[in-house]
């Protein structure tokens, strides 16, 4: 009879799992958390292409013939005769829009002006409505705005400024949603890997974006830089609403084993709707470590995504086709390094020999040290050696990608129930760098040109020069140096007291008790303890 009861229970469970089928047969055979990661991966590719093509489109659609390089400005290039303003600017004399360099800087920064306002809002919206609705709606609105970009650009500079501003506004909620949902989906020993799968979509999107945009601009016209990605985003939206769910508890097809593995691994009571302890969050040094990390790391990322085609054209002298291919290289290196470092971090964490906090700090220190060194070398090259400059840009992005295994995974570790909110605060700081990086470049150019006019009687409209870029690279190296030190010192990975809920302590103690009966240590919420399920050797819990 007992055998019959046991068989009945097994049959009931089997029947329950078999009933969780759908039209998406392939997705049903893959663990639900990896389906979610794949959705974010593809979504980030689509998002990056949709919003990132504008930087290269500006190079093509703006007429450069009115921006004559003054004769005396060649003095700037005297140390590097081969890097002077040669044929590159002539490539774009057919551009239909007449925008000054300063206006280009303002328009390129417009996305970030809107982006910064909805970071914290995004975290709160995710807590209230869930990631599925907020992320999907944001992507839909961003796609529509991207398709409207050609019409807005031809209407007036301020029309495209408004479109880019609104794109930033709706896009600002995306990453807070990402961190919020992984706080409910990511088991402790897989957090770095799952986040890396999502983040790899960003450099891969740029790898596809730059060659694709240069091809579309050369063969079909710059308008198609905005139209083609819009169509791909529509396909992704269908998959997102079919396959994405806010938590394992809400997923209708997840297997019970996976659901139990995730919920017991996280060890928190996800039924609570906690209020954000804003005072404790805003006065927490580990939170500010992430803000500084995001600001200093994003300085390099946002600067490249907005200014790399400009640098390739005006300083290194590449035409539009070569520009598109070479602009993709740094992001290709970043993608490889991101995947490798994330896998290495998870392996080290699972090994249990090094405290998790020092694993994270190790990647932070390595990444920022490499970025600072490369930035200083780039500043001294001044565009004299295009091959070396491109190589250093690639290496810089490779080091920058180590931050994913460093501080970027910490949000779901030190404050899992508020990970969307803490990331929103950090990314607000990161967005500031996206606003000031292009403006600082053009301010430096303007001041350099003003100095030339005062003392060298140089006349004409300013253009980006190697000297101006050198200053920017020095500033970037300084920012990354200070940010890296601050982040490494104050970074924490243990769950902070203000991030624990009423059910967390009991849930954790229960799991420890279960683990003790099996001589096991479960996935731990404290960074200084190993997070792999490891066997105890002749000791008791």
Question: Can you say where each PLM-predicted feature lies in the sequence?
Answer:
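Extracytoplasmic gate region of multi-pass secondary transporters
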Residues: 51-55, 283-339, 401-408, 434-438
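Conserved MFS/SLC helix-loop-helix module at the cytosolic interface between two early adjacent transmembrane helices
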Residues: 117-158
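Central mid-sequence intracellular linker of multi-pass
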Residues: 189-194, 217-283, 482-511
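Cytosolic juxtamembrane N-terminal segment immediately preceding the first transmembrane helix
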Residues: 1-101
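Glycine-rich segments within core transmembrane alpha-helices of 12-TM secondary carriers
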Residues: 174, 183, 190-219, 224-236, ...
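C-terminal ends and interior cores of transmembrane alpha-helices
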Residues: 140-154, 365-383
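Hydrophobic core of transmembrane alpha-helices in multi-pass small-molecule transporters
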Residues: 145, 157-173, 295, 374, ...
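Helix-loop junctions at membrane interfaces in 12-TM secondary transporters
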Residues: 33, 151-163, 354-357, 377-392
